[in-house]
Amino acid sequence: MTTNAVLDAIANRRSIRQYQQRAVDRDTILQLLRAGMAAPSAGNRQPWEFVVTTERQTLDRLADVHPFAKMLYQAPLCISVCANLGRTYEGVPDYWIQDCSAATENILLAAEALGLGAVWCGVFPRMDRVEEIRRILSLPSIVVPLNVVAVGYGAEDPPVKDKWREERVHWEVW
């Protein structure tokens, strides 16, 4: 991949919430998961676990319990990015949040590069959402869902937003 391709994926990534009725094939899903697992992690602990959901009934149940994930009623795929707390960085257990966030962003960028649309829907730290998602996906108590990522072939093409804000950049000191 060229530098421009990476920067293009970053610049063109948008949250896609409407999807075509077209399944995402297993090889493409595996590419997304490989991208997630290529993320950096504190102490290289790689605490992430991914739950891949393609069954319509389960996708609908996830949409039922998450007020901002209603696009799962339409999406053909959900990747729930979770942390196995047994594999967190020793002495600083909350690094899993950064680790799994990096994995999630890699998935979102890979989706863009593969011609897919995706959107990150936060779960943690909303414990009501954590417990509902944990119940639906039968997660063990040592596993915490950080988010659910709806994925599919986009049925919308929202404009790319320029998010550059120079006033938020501070050189050397604040």
Where are these regions (language model features)?
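Acidic, surface-exposed loops and disordered segments
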Residues: 1-174
